[in-house]
């Protein structure tokens, strides 16, 4: 297994970019915006126009995924949770009303949040139009174009709001996809050992949804007149045998709070939380979640906007 220590040639030194905290600033400011909306423009990239469309380009299908209804779905504020476990809906509904499992320190010199990427090389399309290049595998080692770019927006937004956040840019899935979760686990354990103040660990990915014919879906929504990718939180559950997550209830409370916050602030922004028998190294803290920012059908700018919106929602969730 490839070790993801600081000497890893594919790793950038993670840094907290917030200014040193004033000791008297113990509480967050109540006027909310974290990274002002206009500031996202500095992160956006030029997209290719239709004049660059190659022969045989694949099709993109935009879709807004609604909140779920039916026996598998549990209301969560304006959002919902899809229960793919044997835990009863009543138990889940009761659990998500319980108090937050941890408290972050605002404007602290000590890191509170870690953002990382098990599948860092996942990327997005770079076309403005609804097409993608033939043969595009939607992966790149260019950190300005892959999940690291989205993680930067999220980290900067959180730091600007007074939440000391570290962003690790290790390419845990390169050069080999096999073992990427073992690699990212070692990364997270290293951070937790060095910074025991960390309460939240976010593994930021993107989804991949496509038809049998190869058309790719782009989960989208409109916020303030601009298109952004939809997001989906994944929260694991302990099945007693192959998936051991003793703190799954605490993670679920956190997932529900973040889901409620995002969907209340930005209606239509979230897909239902997926509550399932997934491990994803979510045993390491009681604030460990995986979030999918759009999919391989979205363009990068939609994903960058979504990263800012998701982080804004997290700020409000952590304010309580």
Q: Over which residues does each language-model region extend?
A:
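Single conserved hydrophobic/aromatic residue that forms the stacking wall/gate
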Residues: 1-6, 10-13
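Non-catalytic propeptide/linker segments at domain boundaries
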Residues: 11-118, 123-127
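Second-shell loop/turn segments in exported
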Residues: 101-102, 135-147, 170-180, 188-189, ...
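Solvent-exposed loop/turn segments at secondary-structure junctions
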Residues: 120-123, 171-175, 206-211, 238-241, ...
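A short, glycine/acidic-enriched catalytic loop
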Residues: 134-137, 209-247
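Catalytic-core regions of hydrolytic enzymes
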Residues: 141-220
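Active-site-adjacent substrate-binding region
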Residues: 247-274
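Active-site-adjacent mobile loop/cap segments within catalytic or ligand-binding domains
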Residues: 268-320
């Amino acid at each position: 297994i490839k070790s993801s220590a600081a000497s890893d040639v594919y790793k950038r030194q993670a840094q907290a970019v917030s200014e040193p905290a004033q000791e008297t600033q113990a509480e967050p400011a109540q006027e909310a915006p974290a990274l002002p909306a206009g500031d996202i423009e500095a992160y956006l990239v030029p997209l290719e126009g239709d004049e660059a469309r190659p022969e045989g380009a694949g099709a993109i299908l935009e879709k807004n995924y609604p909140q779920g209804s039916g026996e598998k779905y549990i209301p969560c504020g304006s959002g919902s949770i899809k229960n793919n476990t044997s835990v009863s809906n009543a138990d889940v509904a009761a659990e998500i009303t319980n108090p937050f499992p941890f408290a972050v320190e605002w404007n602290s010199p000590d890191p509170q949040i870690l953002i990382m990427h098990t599948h860092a090389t996942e990327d997005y399309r770079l076309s403005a139009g609804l097409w993608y290049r033939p043969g595009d595998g939607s992966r790149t080692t260019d950190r300005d174009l892959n999940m690291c770019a989205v993680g930067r927006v999220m980290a900067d937004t959180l730091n600007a709001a007074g939440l000391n956040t570290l962003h690790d840019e290790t390419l845990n899935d390169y050069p080999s996809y096999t073992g990427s979760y073992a690699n990212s686990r070692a990364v997270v354990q290293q951070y937790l050992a060095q910074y025991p103040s960390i309460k939240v660990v976010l593994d930021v990915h993107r989804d991949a949804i496509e038809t049998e014919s190869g058309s790719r879906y782009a989960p989208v929504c409109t916020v303030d007149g601009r298109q952004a990718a939809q997001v989906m939180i994944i929260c694991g559950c302990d099945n007693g045998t192959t998936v051991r997550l003793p703190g799954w209830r605490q993670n679920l409370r956190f997932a529900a709070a973040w889901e409620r916050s995002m969907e209340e602030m930005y209606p239509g922004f979230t897909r239902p939380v997926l509550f399932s028998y997934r491990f994803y190294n979510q045993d390491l803290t009681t604030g460990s979640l995986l979030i999918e920012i759009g999919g391989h059908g979205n363009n990068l700018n939609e994903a960058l906007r979504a990263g800012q919106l998701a982080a804004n929602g997290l700020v409000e969730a952590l304010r309580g």
